[in-house]
Amino acid sequence: MVTKKIGVIGCGNMGGAILYGALESGVLAKENVYVYDINPAMMEKAKGWGVNLAADDEDVCKNSDIILLAVKPQNAAEALEQCKKALDGKAMMSIVAGVTVERLQAMIDGTPRILRLLPNT
């Protein structure tokens, strides 16, 4: 089981599926997971899984060691702008379609380590 604190920004179809799978398989403990989504319905879904609900994107980053960025491409810059100050020393995984690691680093001044994942649906 992963003991680091994991943050998920975006709990829609992809982010939610990854999170749910990790929780159900026992890879992640719900008390170590922080979630934020701009859609209240997605937050309600995450609440049902027993994870910690964050107040906003920055709150996710402040409380997490590793962050999964799972937002729509058009929402990435706004989410990262909110997180910028809380990303120092963190690692980030991104499943944001069409947004390169270089672009993500430019949005946040290149502070955290970023890994880009390409899930196949």
Locations of regions flagged by a protein language model:
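Rossmann-like NAD(P)(H) cofactor-binding subdomain of soluble oxidoreductases
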Residues: W49, D57-K62, I66-T121
